[in-house]
Amino acid sequence: MTGPSLFEPGMIVKHPNQPEWGLGQVQSAVGGKVTVNFQEAGKVVVDEARVGLVVVSYG
């Protein structure tokens, strides 16, 4: 079972291992899965337990 997400819709993030994706805006965060709309990669679902997204702006 996962706790509450650290991410909220509207936050701007970047993926630490995929800088070419550009910045992304968090769309939703449910059950440890964060849906992010990245500038170059489009919509990507990220597993919070496996990837430490970097917060750039709190929206």
Question: What residue ranges belong to the model's regions?
Answer:
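Mixed-charge, Lys/Arg-rich low-complexity intrinsically disordered regions
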Residues: 1-12, 20
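Glycine-centered tight beta-turn/hairpin loop motif at sheet-sheet or coil-to-beta transitions
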Residues: 19, 39-41
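Short beta-strand-centered aromatic/proline hotspots
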Residues: 22-28
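SH3/SH3-like beta-barrel fold
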Residues: 34-38
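Intrinsically disordered, low-complexity, charged/polar segments
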Residues: 42-59
